[in-house]
Curated annotation (Swiss-Prot):
Cofactor: Zn(2+)
Entry's cofactor comment: Binds 1 zinc ion per subunit.
Pfam families: Ribosomal_L31 (PF01197)
Function description: Binds the 23S rRNA.
Residues bound to Zn(2+): C16, C18, C37, C40
GO biological process: translation
Gene: rpmE
InterPro entries: Ribosomal_bL28/bL31-like_sf, Ribosomal_bL31, Ribosomal_bL31_A, Ribosomal_bL31_sf
Assembly and oligomerization: Part of the 50S ribosomal subunit.
Protein name: Large ribosomal subunit protein bL31
Keywords per UniProt: Metal-binding, Ribonucleoprotein, Ribosomal protein, RNA-binding, rRNA-binding, Zinc
MF (Gene Ontology): metal ion binding; rRNA binding; structural constituent of ribosome
Length: 71
């Protein structure tokens, strides 16, 4: 490998929009701002919204179900 062509891999202070702060390593610089972290992401907090598409499918089948059946 050539010397001097690779970016520096340094410790970076990461700040989330929820206020959580932690350190990691990156080549991006020394400060990084993120929108979502493990403390505020819906998947990790258990506040996920489950989309109910069953109602839409049933509504479609009620309106247009007769077109898909063979006689």
């Amino acid at each position: 490998m050539k010397e001097g062509i690779h970016p520096n891999y340094e410790v970076v202070a990461v700040t989330c929009s929820c206020g959580n702060k932690f350190e990691t390593r990156s080549t991006l610089g020394n400060v990084l701002s993120i929108d979502v972290c493990n403390l505020c992401h819906p998947f990790y907090t258990g506040k996920q919204k489950v989309l109910d598409t069953g109602g839409r499918v049933q509504k479609f089948a009620d309106r247009f179900g007769m077109f898909g059946t063979k006689k």
